[in-house]
Amino acid sequence: MNEYLNIDHVHMSFPTDKGPLEVLNSINLKVKKGEFVSLIGHSGCGKSTVLNIVAGLLNATQGGVLLEDKEVTEPGPDRAVVFQNHSLLPWLTVYENVRLAVDQVFKKTKSKQERDEWTRHNLELVHMSHALDRKPDEIS
């Protein structure tokens, strides 16, 4: 059986004033379809970095990620991340904040009208249609 997720020799480093800071060094993980895996570790050990690479929000410095035998190079509609410390851009409306992500994920596959409909549909799913034009400080 092929792996559902294959993280293959993933390295990640970030530039700093003192040179590259290596945060991941040759990470390997294979997950079969239906299998559940937890990443456990202390703060700062790279768990979120691995998940951001799998989500397509970051590109590994070396190595790669395959999801259902397709290389992950950008965010996609088949993956989602719930951030620990989320924030909305205070100068944008609820609709505009959500639309940023929708445009990023679907810009190549959906028309402008389809992205508008998708944004409104998903805000309706979480009962936020009434707040489309409100700024984050106007909702609770």
List the predicted regions and their residue ranges.
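Conserved ABC ATPase "signature" region
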Residues: 110-131
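The feature captures the beta-strand-to-loop junction immediately N-terminal to the Walker
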Residues: 40-42
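Helix-to-loop junction immediately C-terminal to a conserved catalytic motif
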Residues: 55
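Short beta-strand immediately N-terminal to the Walker A/P-loop
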Residues: 37-38, 81
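Short helical segment in ABC ATPase nucleotide-binding domains corresponding to the A-loop/adjacent helical element
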Residues: 95-103, 116
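Conserved ABC ATPase signature
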Residues: 135-140
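Conserved ABC transporter NBD signature motif
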Residues: 63-75, 111
